[in-house]
A protein has these predicted regions:
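C-terminal and inter-domain tail/linker signature
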Residues: 1-127
Length: 127
């Protein structure tokens, strides 16, 4: 059974995504040195990610006790990327920590170039 976070991302539904996160969720991005903290900041960043990624699709998922890994493919500025959303869950199944890994380096650089201007104001307030 898929985690509601996956369902929300696939539907591009920010309200549903917000409902899957704890108030104090921490998001570790592959293109930011400091994590984003708090549900409002994380939802704003993820909304921007959804605008930058095209052809986004989850291709696999792995689940364990209190954790979920969602493997994905997408395109960023014409570059194919592969990545993984690693979710750490609380006792209610809500996301307490989200770590995103991305490859190859050319895709990470493209992502950083696209996301930097969009989220700089968020990063200053959450690190």
């Amino acid at each position: 059974m898929s985690h509601p976070f996956r369902t929300a991302v696939e539907a591009r539904d920010l309200d549903a995504m917000r409902a899957t996160l704890t108030e104090d969720v921490v998001f570790f991005s592959p293109v930011a040195f400091q994590p984003f903290r708090g549900r409002d900041a994380v939802v704003e960043v993820l909304g921007n990610v959804l605008e930058v990624f095209t052809n986004f699709t989850y291709t696999d998922e792995l689940a364990g006790d209190g954790t979920q890994a969602l493997v994905f493919r997408a395109t960023v500025d014409g570059k194919q990327v592969e990545g993984l959303d690693h979710l750490m869950l609380d006792e209610h199944g809500k996301v307490t920590r989200l770590t995103v890994m991305l490859r190859p380096l050319s895709g990470v650089i493209a992502m950083a170039e696209q996301m930097g201007p969009r989220v700089a104001h968020i990063a200053k307030g959450t690190g």
